[in-house]
Amino acid sequence: MATTHLDVCAVVPAAGFGRRMQTECPKQYLSIGNQTILEHSVHALLAHPRVKRVVIAISPGDSRFAQLPLANHPQITVVDGGEERADSVLAGLKAAGDAQWVLVHDAARPCLHQDDLARLLALSETSRTGGILAAPVRDTMKRAETGKNAIAHTVDRNGLWHALTPQFFPRELLHDCLTRALNEGATITDEASALEYCGFHPQLVEGRADNIKVTRPEDLALAEFYLTRTIHQENT
């Protein structure tokens, strides 16, 4: 069984563009304060002592990353990402060395709290399949009629969770599940869905709902608020 002293490698797929942000700059390179969103996301991972290395998968044509101080960080490895998220994660896993467990974290999710990360990492003591940070659905959920912006019915929210990141799995298991799912044409929306496809049932670790992913323009101000609040709390 895995123990807490095992080093962890994190993989950050950062090859996407994010057209919903309505900006020419990829969202991970937008700034909050004096750092990019990507830097906030990566530094939150490196703040935990078990995370010894972060592999960042960037677009082969990316000229922005090399301009960041992060590019010269001794714990950072950069690889070329792929067309899809799963391709980028696989590229990152190949560069993860002999790490037995890996975290996968969104490049545009800068508000990760250390207590959430610590509880997720504790799964290596109790689980053989790992798990994800997630938040219970609290809003009323509606399913739309096919092809229409009209309500078909209300979805029972009991047992529904919002999947967050990081997601935390044994490296070899995640590699094998992603490879099989891609080879068989399965729809993979996050890393956990690859394990689900292969018959595994990752754990849900309840995380904070303010661990948001910056996807739309209005998310940027919200992420800035959350980060500013966290910094203020840490300094008081």
Curated annotation (Swiss-Prot):
The catalytic activity, as recorded, is: 2-C-methyl-D-erythritol 4-phosphate + CTP + H(+) = 4-CDP-2-C-methyl-D-erythritol + diphosphate
- Record site feature (Positions MEP for the nucleophilic attack), residues: 157, 213
UniProt superkingdom = Bacteria
Principal EC category: transferase
Q: Which PROSITE patterns match?
A: ISPD
Q: Which GO terms describe its molecular function?
A: 2-C-methyl-D-erythritol 4-phosphate cytidylyltransferase activity
Q: What is its EC number?
A: 2.7.7.60
Coiled-coil ranges (or none): none
Keyword Kinase appears in the UniProt entry: no
Marked site (Transition state stabilizer) residue numbers? 20, 27
Q: Which InterPro entries match?
A: IspD, IspD/TarI, IspD/TarI_cytidylyltransf_bact, ISPD_synthase_CS, Nucleotide-diphossugar_trans
Protein keywords:
Isoprene biosynthesis, Nucleotidyltransferase, Transferase
Instruction: Share what the entry says about its subunit structure, partners included.
Output: Homodimer.
PANTHER family to which the protein is assigned, alphabetical: 2-C-METHYL-D-ERYTHRITOL 4-PHOSPHATE CYTIDYLYLTRANSFERASE, CHLOROPLASTIC
The record, for HAMAP family, names:
IspD (MF_00108)
- Kindly provide the name given to this protein in its UniProt entry: 2-C-methyl-D-erythritol 4-phosphate cytidylyltransferase
Q: Which organism is it from?
A: Escherichia coli O127:H6 (strain E2348/69 / EPEC)
Q: Which gene encodes it?
A: ispD
